[in-house]
Regions:
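Terminal targeting signals and extreme-terminal segments of soluble enzymes
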Residues: 1-166
């Protein structure tokens, strides 16, 4: 019996491109892992992530959660199909004063038109600082990552999935 799995070559390339994006560079977001229904990112916390009161800006947690929950769903969406966040709910539990932040997420459900994922932001000691859920709308091919990358003039991505014998 044949099945499909994520192509490691595809994942390496999308991580490389995502990490090089202007937003990821500005926020210091680095993707550590994308696998079946799961993603993990890290953020090297700097002063630019602080608000006027010198605490972490709440938008940092939101950005981490939006990013990591999107990538957790990515593995479950068919190739050349787009999707976007339509609702992000963030619960801040604790301030972060310094050090590396980690975001982890898992896909909860991926349907034909709506997907749902949940994620956590943790500090270096594994303490949960924020929790969030993301609702995403599944779109068409015009909104896919593959089409966007080609539109930017980059080489086409390797196939997202590869066949396997089960």
């Amino acid at each position: 019996m044949k099945g499909k799995k994520l192509n490691p070559e595809h994942i390496r390339e999308v991580i490389r491109l995502a990490d090089a994006s202007n937003f990821s560079q500005m926020m210091n977001i680095e993707i550590m892992e994308i696998s079946d229904e799961y993603a993990k990112v890290k953020v090297n916390f700097e002063d630019k992530h602080r608000n006027t009161l010198m605490n972490i800006h709440g938008g940092v947690y939101a950005s981490i959660l939006d990013t990591v929950t999107w990538w957790a769903v990515y593995s479950e969406i068919p190739e050349r199909i787009g999707f976007t966040t339509i609702d992000l709910n963030v619960n801040d539990f604790s301030m972060h004063r310094g050090g590396t932040l980690y975001g982890e997420a898992k896909a909860v459900r991926v349907g034909r038109s709506i997907a749902m994922s949940e994620g956590w932001v943790k500090d270096e000691n594994g303490r949960v600082l924020a929790f969030g859920t993301s609702k995403l709308m599944v779109l068409d091919e015009k909104s896919s990552l593959e089409v966007a990358i080609e539109g930017l003039g980059y080489a086409p991505l390797p196939p997202k999935f590869i066949d396997i014998e089960e």
